[in-house]
Amino acid sequence: MAEKEHYERTKPHVNIGTIGHVDHGKTTLTAAITKVLAAKGLAKAEDYSDIDAAPEEKERGITINTAHVEYETEKRHYAHIDAPGHADYVKNMITGAAQMDGAILVVAATDGPMPQTREHILLARQVGVEYIVVFLNKTDLVDDDELVDLVEMEVRDLLSEYDFPGDDVPVVRGSALKALEGDPEQEQVVLHLLDVVDEYIPTPKRPTDKPFMMPVEDVFTITGRGTVASGRIDRGTVKIGDEVEIVGLKEDVIKSTVTGVEMFHKTLDLGEAGDNVGILLRGVSHDQIERGQVLAEPGSIQTHKQFKGEVYVMTKEEGGRHTPFFSNYRPQFYFHTTDVTGTIELPDGVEMVMPGDNVTFTVELQKPVALEKGLKFTIREGGHTVGAGVVSEVLD
């Protein structure tokens, strides 16, 4: 086996992604960014079709959840996630958005904000993406600047509605397609957008001092080497020789030792919070670990089935339920990277919960999940997100 290239950590690392309505140009912008930076030797140009193919691979039994591309600016190293726009991929948006320190919201000036624009802003708010930069795309197709101004105002209002600083959020106008096609003026716009991202989205303070924890997104086997769990390190650090536990979904906890850490197919001395890595585990078979579990420092996190959640229930207009729900309602709770069915018990004096309500209720999960206070989750029903919340208290 050829010796892997070593990944050198020289610049601060930031996770970002493109969000927004289907066909507004998220993937075109992602491709344009890699192309423009590749010309400066800071990225490998990725074809639109390669990036766009990521969501399709689910059907063929391979779980590639979102397209990951990497690039650098003069100041930073970025891992960029392109979250597919279709409702079918909301689950991926949830695992994807959870991995963003900031996001580029792409809005087509020809359309203005659309239903998924709103849904992605809501999801960004709920999964803790605190910084959004707006790219108003396709501005070359709008003759009247005042119309573009109007769209910008609408986007700012929408961001403010979800507690983002709508008045202060930077907005860049341009054409991702023209940049991708090599228009020099639009290539400069893309570089300007990246400067804005460099400046506006702060380098996150990584919780590297906390105990190691990584939600498992995918599991695969490398012949002759063993089982690899991949995901984004939530907190702490991990290196070869570390003891870890596989926690969640099952009653028993499995202990293992880390025998390899890789990032972007390169070996890594130390994986730390925020890195997307593959972790090779000693003595663990493929069927002993699954998506939705977590890898954690031994003893640092426990499984629970009962918790109190602070929840926002989406309105019909946001794509949520059309009708209220009552105690004993049994939706899916999406934790870390997987759905678990749970039964809701409403507090005394609350007869029912209407779409649009904020509510605190108790949940009894069917399977144990690695839980703690502050963990975010979404509530889903029939493949649609109907609410989002945060664990306010663990009860068992």
From Swiss-Prot:
- Tell me what reaction this enzyme catalyses: GTP + H2O = GDP + phosphate + H(+)
Subcellular location(s): the record lists: Cytoplasm
Ligand binding (GTP): 20-27, 82-86, 137-140
Which residues does UniProt call coiled coil? Answer: none
Ranges for region G2: 61-65
Source taxon at top rank: Bacteria
**EC number of this enzyme:** 3.6.5.3
Which keywords label this protein?
Answer: Cytoplasm, Elongation factor, GTP-binding, Hydrolase, Magnesium, Metal-binding, Nucleotide-binding, Protein biosynthesis
Chief location of this protein? cytoplasm
Segments of this protein annotated with the region G3: 82-85
User: Pfam families, alphabetically?
Assistant: GTP_EFTU, GTP_EFTU_D2, GTP_EFTU_D3
Which portions of the sequence form the region G4?
Answer: 137-140
Which PROSITE patterns does the entry mention?
G_TR_1, G_TR_2
GO molecular function per UniProt: GTP binding; GTPase activity; translation elongation factor activity
Q: Give the start-end ranges of region G1.
A: 20-27
**Segments forming domain tr-type G:** 11-205
InterPro entries found in the cross-reference section: EF-Tu_GTP-bd, EF-Tu_GTPase, EFTu-like_2, EFTU_2, G_TR_CS, P-loop_NTPase, Small_GTP-bd, T_Tr_GTP-bd_dom
Q: Do the record's keywords include Transmembrane helix? A: no
Q: Does the keyword Metal-binding apply?
A: yes
Task: Name the residues that bind Mg(2+).
Answer: 27
Where is the region G5? 175-177
- Which PANTHER family does this chain map to? ELONGATION FACTOR TU, MITOCHONDRIAL, ELONGATION FACTOR TU-RELATED
This protein's assembly is summarised as: Monomer.
Q: What does this protein do?
A: GTP hydrolase that promotes the GTP-dependent binding of aminoacyl-tRNA to the A-site of ribosomes during protein biosynthesis.
Identify its protein family.
Belongs to the TRAFAC class translation factor GTPase superfamily. Classic translation factor GTPase family. EF-Tu/EF-1A subfamily.
Q: Under what name is this protein listed? A: Elongation factor Tu
